[in-house]
């Protein structure tokens, strides 16, 4: 809430106008109760002797989500022996600074997971989140169809993992609607990420306000190279390729340190079936 107040002071716009429409019952009972969001979700596959991490491709027909294609995509992932899992980075809201991640390397490394769900529902939600993060031509119709499909899938998929990924979809949907000024005509169950709202309010770094404010509020240099070690050398030696679409949600993948730890995760961390397993 304090970040919301700071944003209101910077922009001169009351807090209420920044908040998306929510129903009181949904606001009182959020999908996931903590300010942590799953980010940088990529599908990881093994191809010959290489690992490939790539975004879920956009599946659309007449501007809407192609549900039949999505079902087949999920089935193929669950049945493929070459599918390794999804990369998932767990970030607290204020740590996601749009173009920077406000975490030291040793902490960020622990936040990167390789999730290999066995449930079709969780797999589908991960695909939808990856698709949402990497969608370059966002439209109200497509955004609405993603959130509607995700909610239906979440309703029949119990567990904390489904709730957590659904929270990410709700949050990024609200954020995309705010950033791109899309009229989705729906009640969101999460609020836009505050740092993304601040990024939009401040404006481009070439403007006087952006040039002054962005280094203060939206830059962090914690995630920098700390020197090469044996894991780094092994990461460079093993072929791991990362593919993604350039959107406001994937700016972190331009950071070499982020890429390094994602690759290390795919190489050295065993896949887990749940982010909440003990």
From Swiss-Prot:
It is found in: Virion; Virion tegument; Host cytoplasm; Host Golgi apparatus. The keyword DNA-binding does not apply. Coiled coil: none annotated. Its main location: virion. Keywords: Host cytoplasm, Host Golgi apparatus, Virion, Virion tegument. GO terms for cellular component: host cell Golgi apparatus; viral tegument. It holds the Pfam family Herpes_UL7. It comes from the Viruses. Plays a critical role in cytoplasmic virus egress. Participates in the final step of tegumentation and envelope acquisition within the host cytoplasm. Belongs to the herpesviridae cytoplasmic envelopment protein 1 family. This is Cytoplasmic envelopment protein 1. It comes from Human herpesvirus 8 type P (isolate GK18) (HHV-8).
